[in-house]
Amino acid sequence: MSYHRWNSPVSGTVVKDYNLYGSYYSETLPQGFESPNSPDPAAPNDFQAYITETASRAVIFIKADNPKIGLMCFVAVGMAEVLGNEIIVKVGQHINKGDQLGIFHFGGSTHVLLFRSGVNVKFNLHGQEPSLGSHNIKVHDEIARVE
């Protein structure tokens, strides 16, 4: 099982947080059937835009200590069988990069990081392309850098 706790991508102050309740095991009708050869086992990953809009989500706005970042938003997206998103930080709390923000309760998941316009973010894919064969990036390893 993958790690289902959320860690802050930046140091800063929690400005606002809330849960958006959504679907459970929602899929689009054509999901997984784009391939002319057979159903696609990667379909849940390929349809993350849909899942991000319909699934249960936890939203945390953080005013980063780094002025190059400013206000940013972390969105935890519960995929497939996630039963809930638990936010453990509080509004007004100062957090450090790597501190736990919350946790998914049972099941699959993904995350979204939103930055304001003009923030130059360079992602580190650790020498791999996103696919079913890619490996998890270790907790606290760099996933992106603000330039």
Describe the residue ranges of each PLM region.
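Contiguous, well-folded functional domains in the mature portion of proteins
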Residues: 1-147
